[in-house]
Amino acid sequence: MSIEVTVEIPKGSRNKYEIDHETGKVYLDRYLFTPMAYPLDYGYIDHTLGEDGDPLDALVILPESVFPAVVVKSRIIGVFKMTDEAGGDDKLLSVLDDPRYDHIQDISDVSDFLKDEIEHFFVHYKDLEKGKHVDGSGWGDKAEAEKIHAEAIDRYKA
């Protein structure tokens, strides 16, 4: 399933950017309190609504980071399931929709190291921020991720 991810934060950044959905302006929300950087390009999927009331979050595996506000066509391959102080905050994992990535079709095709890196980042990136917390509950496969995506589309339309 092909999706479009609007990247807010490039891989390797400690800047937490947010795009204003009404104006399209990119704002610096904060500089991460922890000495950690985003493990992959990170953004959201338009016309979806996650359990936290924001568009569904997504990470993209690609060979080179892009700039904030760039839209990347990618394929859903899995989901990191988590909650934070605002409730459910799942992160879809996707891969660049490019034939050079045809060998990655499901979460089982992603290295354990990369999954561990992503999980560690999201479980700990808010550790030094008062009143914030994250609980990770593991990985889901492509089918589960696509179901979460479909539910987020329905939630947006409701």
From Swiss-Prot:
PANTHER family the record matches: INORGANIC PYROPHOSPHATASE
Domain of life where this protein originates: Bacteria
Assembly behavior: Homohexamer.
One GO CC term, this protein: cytoplasm
GO molecular function terms listed in the Swiss-Prot or TrEMBL record: inorganic diphosphate phosphatase activity; magnesium ion binding
Cellular localization per UniProt: Cytoplasm
Assigned keywords, A-Z: Cytoplasm, Hydrolase, Magnesium, Metal-binding
Enzyme Commission number(s) from the entry: 3.6.1.1
Enzyme class name: hydrolase
Reaction it catalyzes: diphosphate + H2O = 2 phosphate + H(+)
Pfam families reported for this sequence: Pyrophosphatase (PF00719)
Task performed by this protein: Catalyzes the hydrolysis of inorganic pyrophosphate (PPi) forming two phosphate ions.
Positions that bind Mg(2+) 2: 8, 57
Entry binding sites for Mg(2+) 3: 84, 89
Protein name stated in the entry: Inorganic pyrophosphatase
Cofactor(s) required, per the database record: Mg(2+)
InterPro entries: Pyrophosphatase, Pyrophosphatase_sf
UniProt-listed HAMAP family: Inorganic_PPase (MF_00209)
Binding, substrate: 16, 30, 42, 125
Active-site residues, Swiss-Prot/TrEMBL: 89
Organism (species): Corynebacterium glutamicum (strain ATCC 13032 / DSM 20300 / JCM 1318 / BCRC 11384 / CCUG 27702 / LMG 3730 / NBRC 12168 / NCIMB 10025 / NRRL B-2784 / 534)
Residues engaged in binding Mg(2+) 1: 52, 57, 89
GO terms (BP aspect): phosphate-containing compound metabolic process
Family note: Belongs to the PPase family.
Main location: cytoplasm
